[in-house]
C-alpha cells in the first residue's frame, strides 16, 4: 500500500501517520531523513546533496526523486510506504509519475486555517521531558506549569502565530494545487483520492482511515 498524505502543517497528519504505519506495517518516508542519511553515507547522491545544501541552495527535484526511488526499493518498503512532505509541488508529482513511482492512495487532511492556527498557537511544551500541552484542548493542571515537575512551560518558535500563518500561505501557494492534481489522477483511475475531515477527534479520524484503506 503506497500512500501520500496531503494537508497543511497542524492538520493532524503526523498523529495519523503513526497509526497507518503500525496498522499496515509500512514505513514513513521523509525526504529530510533521506537527505540526512544520504549525506551521512557519503554515497554519490549524498555528495551531490551535500554540495548543494552547503551552498545554501535547495536540493533539485531530480535528486530527491532519485533518493525516493532508492529508498522505496529497500526491503522494508516491500508492502508499501507512506510519503509525508513530498511531493510538495506539481512538478515534483509529475517527476514521480515519470519515474514510475505509482501511488495507491492520496489522503487529504482537511482542516480550516483558523482551527490550525488555534491548534498550533495554543501548544505549550515542557522542553526537558518533551511533554506537550494545549491551553484549550489539553491544559496543564496549573496554568503555564508542567504537571509533573511544576516547571515553566514554553512556546516553540515554530508555534508562534506569525510563523504558522506564513507556513499556511506557503502551503496554499505551493502544495494545495496538488489536491486538484491528484483528484484528476483519481478520475483517470491512476490512484484513489480521499478527503479526510481532520477537525474530528483523533479516534474518529482513525476510524475513517480504516474505512478508506480497508
Curated annotation (Swiss-Prot):
Catalytic activity as recorded in UniProt: AMP + ATP = 2 ADP
Places the protein is found: Cytoplasm
Gene that produces this protein: adk
Native organism taxonomy: Bacteria, Pseudomonadati, Pseudomonadota, Gammaproteobacteria, Enterobacterales
Family: Belongs to the adenylate kinase family.
Main subcellular location of this protein, as a coarse class: cytoplasm
Pathway: Purine metabolism; AMP biosynthesis via salvage pathway; AMP from ADP: step 1/1
Annotated stretches, region: LID: 122-159
Keyword ATP-binding on entry: yes
GO BP annotations listed: AMP salvage
Segment forming the signal sequence: none
Protein name, UniProt field: Adenylate kinase
Taxonomic superkingdom: Bacteria
Subunit structure: Monomer.
Segments of this protein annotated with the region NMP: 30-59
Residues that hold AMP according to the record: 31, 36, 57-59, 85-88, 92, 156, 167
GO CC terms, sorted: cytoplasm
Assigned keywords, A-Z: Acetylation, ATP-binding, Cytoplasm, Kinase, Nucleotide biosynthesis, Nucleotide-binding, Transferase
EC number of this enzyme: 2.7.4.3
N6-acetyllysine, modified sites: 192
Comment block on domains: Consists of three domains, a large central CORE domain and two small peripheral domains, NMPbind and LID, which undergo movements during catalysis. The LID domain closes over the site of phosphoryl transfer upon ATP binding. Assembling and dissambling the active center during each catalytic cycle provides an effective means to prevent ATP hydrolysis.
Binding site for ATP: 10-15, 123, 132-133, 200
GO molecular function: adenylate kinase activity; ATP binding
InterPro entries to which the protein is assigned, alphabetical: Adenyl_kin_sub, Adenylat/UMP-CMP_kin, Adenylat_kinase_CS, Adenylate_kinase_lid-dom, P-loop_NTPase
The organism of origin for this protein: Shigella dysenteriae serotype 1 (strain Sd197)
Pfam families found in the cross-reference section: ADK, ADK_lid
Function: Catalyzes the reversible transfer of the terminal phosphate group between ATP and AMP. Plays an important role in cellular energy homeostasis and in adenine nucleotide metabolism.
Amino acid at each position: 500500500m503506497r500512500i501520500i498524505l496531503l494537508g497543511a502543517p497542524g492538520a493532524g497528519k503526523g498523529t495519523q501517520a503513526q497509526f497507518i504505519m503500525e496498522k499496515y506495517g509500512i514505513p514513513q518516508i521523509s525526504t529530510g531523513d533521506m537527505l540526512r542519511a544520504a549525506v551521512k553515507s557519503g554515497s554519490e547522491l549524498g555528495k551531490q546533496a551535500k554540495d548543494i545544501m552547503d551552498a545554501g541552495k535547495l536540493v533539485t527535484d531530480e535528486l530527491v526523486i532519485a533518493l525516493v526511488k532508492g529508498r522505496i526499493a529497500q526491503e522494508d518498503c516491500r508492502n508499501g510506504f507512506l510519503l509525508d512532505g513530498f511531493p510538495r509541488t506539481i512538478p515534483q508529482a509529475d517527476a514521480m509519475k515519470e519515474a514510475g513511482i505509482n501511488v495507491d492512495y492520496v489522503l487529504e487532511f482537511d482542516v480550516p486555517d483558523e482551527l490550525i492556527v488555534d491548534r498550533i498557537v495554543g501548544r505549550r511544551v515542557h522542553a526537558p521531558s518533551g511533554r506537550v500541552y494545549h491551553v484549550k484542548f489539553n491544559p496543564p493542571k496549573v496554568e503555564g506549569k508542567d504537571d509533573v515537575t511544576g516547571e515553566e512551560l514554553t512556546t516553540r518558535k515554530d508555534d508562534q502565530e506569525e510563523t504558522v500563518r506564513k507556513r499556511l500561505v506557503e502551503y496554499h501557494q505551493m502544495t494545495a494545487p496538488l489536491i486538484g492534481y491528484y483528484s484528476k489522477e483519481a478520475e483517470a483511475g491512476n490512484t484513489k483520492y480521499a478527503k479526510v475531515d481532520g477537525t474530528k477527534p483523533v479516534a474518529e479520524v482513525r476510524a475513517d482511515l480504516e474505512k478508506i484503506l480497508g
